[in-house]
Amino acid sequence: MTTETGPDSEVKKAQEEAPQQPEAAAAVTTPVTPAGHGHPEANSNEKHPSQQDTRPAEQSLDMEEKDYSEADGLSERTTPSKAQKSPQKIAKKYKSAICRVTLLDASEYECEVEKHGRGQVLFDLVCEHLNLLEKDYFGLTFCDADSQKNWLDPSKEIKKQIRSSPWNFAFTVKFYPPDPAQLTEDITRYYLCLQLRADIITGRLPCSFVTHALLGSYAVQAELGDYDAEEHVGNYVSELRFAPNQTRELEERIMELHKTYRGMTPGEAEIHFLENAKKLSMYGVDLHHAKDSEGIDIMLGVCANGLLIYRDRLRINRFAWPKILKISYKRSNFYIKIRPGEYEQFESTIGFKLPNHRSAKRLWKVCIEHHTFFRLVSPEPPPKGFLVMGSKFRYSGRTQAQTRQASALIDRPAPFFERSSSKRYTMSRSLDGAEFSRPASVSENHDAGPDGDKRDEDGESGGQRSEAEEGEVRTPTKIKELKPEQETTPRHKQEFLDKPEDVLLKHQASINELKRTLKEPNSKLIHRDRDWERERRLPSSPASPSPKGTPEKANERAGLREGSEEKVKPPRPRAPESDTGDEDQDQERDTVFLKDNHLAIERKCSSITVSSTSSLEAEVDFTVIGDYHGSAFEDFSRSLPELDRDKSDSDTEGLLFSRDLNKGAPSQDDESGGIEDSPDRGACSTPDMPQFEPVKTETMTVSSLAIRKKIEPEAVLQTRVSAMDNTQQVDGSASVGREFIATTPSITTETISTTMENSLKSGKGAAAMIPGPQTVATEIRSLSPIIGKDVLTSTYGATAETLSTSTTTHVTKTVKGGFSETRIEKRIIITGDEDVDQDQALALAIKEAKLQHPDMLVTKAVVYRETDPSPEERDKKPQES
C-alpha cells in the first residue's frame, strides 16, 4: 500500500523553499497523484505549486508592460489557466502613431513612430527620407496649445513633449552655420537656402530692395537654370516669391540680373545666395518676446555669437557668449550673469520678463543649445545624482566642431535631388507678428547693423565665424595704376532710373512736410538710386571665383566707357600698354571682393570713415588714430551723402584707399603704397605690408587721378587725393609730393544744417570744428555700451567744394563710463551760379541723412545763405593786404 507521505513532504518542502528561492520554485516539479478523497490538504497543496510556477513568469512579463494588476491583487485566486497565456505575451504589439512632418519645400512626409519612441527616432527617419547626412544643423518643431514654436527634444519621448492629438511637426534649420561655404554637400546648402528664403518672405530676415533683387536672382538661377529667351518670356518670375511685398519693379530687376548669370550652375547660385544672406543682420537670430526691467517691450535674439537685445527693430545691446557667466530662469523671469569688465570688480545680473514660465524655459533651453553647439568642443554630460540643483537639461547632440569633423569624413557621390519651386510662400509676417509692410529702404539698418557686430565686436565670441571670413580677407591684392576705363561701376544706368529723383523731391518740397519729417523719427524715405548704386557694388561670392560669379562687371565697365566717351577728353598720361592685362585681372579680383564685402557694413559709428564726394575738383584728407577692426573701413562708406546723385551727366571722381597699416613701425618707403597716374610710375604693389582689407574703390569717374599715402610711426594714415579738371594738364613728371587742385569761384552758397540724435541720454562729447566755412551741421549722436574697451577718440573730416555741392563730415567717438558716444556733424554746401531752392535742398539733405542713419533721430535743421564778394571786392583785398 502506497502512502502519499513522499509527495506531501516534497510539496511542503517546495513551499518552504519558495519564499527563499523564487526562481527555483518555478523549476520544482511535483508528481501527479490521484485526487485523494481522504486528503483535502493534498488537493489544496497541489494548487500552490502550479501557482508558484506561473507567478514569477507573469511578474517578469508584467514588469515590462508596467502593469502590476496581476501581481498585486490575484495572489491566491490565480487559476492554472494563466500559465497557458503567459508565453504568448512575449510577442508584444507596440502602439504606433502617425507623424506628419512639413518639409522645407512645403511637401509633407508621413511616417509611423512608436508612441513611446524618442524624438531622435522621428528625426532620423526624416533625414533618411531627405537623404541628408549633415543633419546636426536641423531640427523638428511643433506648436503647443499657445501656438508657440517648440523644439522637439531628441532625447525624450515624443508623447511626453507634444500634448495635442495630431502629431504635426516642421523640419527647419535650428543652427544657422556662420559660414555656409564650409558645408560639405550641396543638398545641405539647398535646404539651408530654402529655410532662408522662407525667413525672407515671412519677414524674419529683413533686407533691402537691392538685396531682395540679388538673392531672388540667385534663387531663380538655381531653380530655372540659365535664361532662355524662348522659354522665359514675359514676366516668368511672377509666380515665384522673393519678398514680403513683391512688386513688379522687383521682378523686373530680378529678371535683369538673371539674364547675366549664364553658365552658373545651381550649386554655384546657391553658394552666392548663402554668401550674401549670411551677412544680413538678422541671419540666424531666434527672436523671443520679452520686457526689460522698465516694462518696455523688447525682443531677445539668440544667435551663434551670443544674446542680442532689440527694441523697435533696432539692436540696442549685445552680450557675447564669453561675457555671459550664467543663464537661468525663475518662473517667468530670465536672468543672465555678466562677467565683470576691465574696470569692474563685481559681476552683474540682468533680468528680463517673459510672457510666462514656459516662454522663459524655452528661451533658456535655446540659449543652452546655441552656446553648446557653437562654443563647446563636445557637449556637457547631464548632471548625475538623485538630488541635483537646477535643471538636468543639456544639449545632447553634436557640436559644430564635431559636425565639421564628421562632415569631412563623408565619402559618397553627390546625391541627386530636384530643386523645388518657391511658390508656396504667400504669407508676409513681421518679427513681432504684425503685418510686414514697410518700405524696402527701412531695413537698410538691418542689412548693415547687427550683423557686423556679430562678427567684429568680439573676436573671442565670433572666433569660428571670423576665422573663415578672415581667410577671405587675407586674399593678396595689388594696387595698380587706375585708369578711368577700369573704374568698377558707373554712377547710373539709364534703364534703372524708373523713378527719377524729381518725383521724390516733389514730395519733400513743402515746409509742413519737413516739419512732419522732423517730428516722426521713424519715418523712412525710399531712395531707389542709392539702392541701385549699392547693388552694383554687391556681390558675387569669393567662394566661386569663376567669371560666372561676376556677371555685372562687363556691363558696368561697358556703361562706364559709354558715359566717358560722350565727353571730349583732353590728353592725359597713361600707363604702359603692357601692364593693362595684369591690371585688369587684379582690378577685377579686387572688385569682386569689394562688392562681396559691401553687405558686411556695420551701422555704427567707428574710428574711421570714407569720404564720398561728388565733384570735379576735390581734396580729401583723412586721419586714422588708433587700431580698428577689419570692417571699420566700411562703416561710413554708405553713410556720407551724394546730393547731386540725380545729375547723371555730371563728372565725378574716384577715390582709391588702401588700408595697409604697420602699427608702431614706419614704412620703409613712404611711397610704396601710393599710386599716381603718370607715365613715369609703373604698377605699385604692397606685398610686404599686412592687408587688413583689400582696396576700397568708390564708384566714380575721373579724368586723372593722383593719390599719395604715408604711413607714420604713430599708426596714423594720411591720404590726400587730388583730382584734376578736364581742362587742366597734368605734368607727367610731377613728384608725389605735389598736388594739383583746380578751384572754381563760387557765387552763391546754399548751406543746409541738419542735426540727428539717437541716445539714451544727452552725450557730453562735442565734435571739434573743422576749419572751413562755418555753414553746416548734420549732427548724429549714438550711445551704446562698450565693455572692456579703451577710451578711443576718432576724428574725421573731409571737405570738398564743387560747382554743385560740398560736404564736410566730422565724427567724434568717445568712450566714457562704459558707454560709447558718437557724434556726427555734417556740413553740406551747395554752390551754383543760380539761386538754389532752399526747400528742395533741405528736403534732400534730411532724406539723405535719414537714409544713411535710419537708427538716428533728426533733431535740428538749419538753412542759411552766404554770398561771395563781387570780383571787384576780391581784387581789392589782395591789393590792401
Curated annotation (Swiss-Prot):
Highest expression in brain, lower in heart, kidney, pancreas, placenta, lung and skeletal muscle. CDD domains: FERM_B-lobe, FERM_C_4_1_family, FERM_F1_EPB41L1. Residues 38-50, 444-457, 466-501, 514-538, 550-577 have a biased composition (Basic and acidic residues). Changing P854S: In MRD11; results in a 50% reduction of interaction of 4.1N protein to GRIA1 compared to wild-type. It comes from the Eukaryota. InterPro entries: Band_4.1_C, Band_41_domain, Ez/rad/moesin-like, FA, FERM/acyl-CoA-bd_prot_sf, FERM_2, FERM_central, FERM_CS. The modification Phosphoserine is found at residues 75, 378, 430, 437, 461, 466, 510, 540-541, 544, 546, 564, 578, 639, 648, 650, 667, 672, 678, 685, 722, 784, 870. GO terms for molecular function: actin binding; structural molecule activity. Residues 76-87 have a biased composition (Polar residues). GO terms for biological process: actomyosin structure organization; cortical actin cytoskeleton organization. Residues 97-378 form the FERM domain. Residues 17-35 have a biased composition (Low complexity). The modification Phosphothreonine is found at T30, T79, T475, T550, T580, T686. PROSITE patterns: FERM_1 (PS00660), FERM_2 (PS00661), FERM_3 (PS50057). May function to confer stability and plasticity to neuronal membrane via multiple interactions, including the spectrin-actin-based cytoskeleton, integral membrane channels and membrane-associated guanylate kinases. PANTHER family: 4.1 G PROTEIN, BAND 4.1-LIKE PROTEIN 1. It is linked to Intellectual developmental disorder, autosomal dominant 11: A disorder characterized by significantly below average general intellectual functioning associated with impairments in adaptive behavior and manifested during the developmental period. This is Band 4.1-like protein 1.
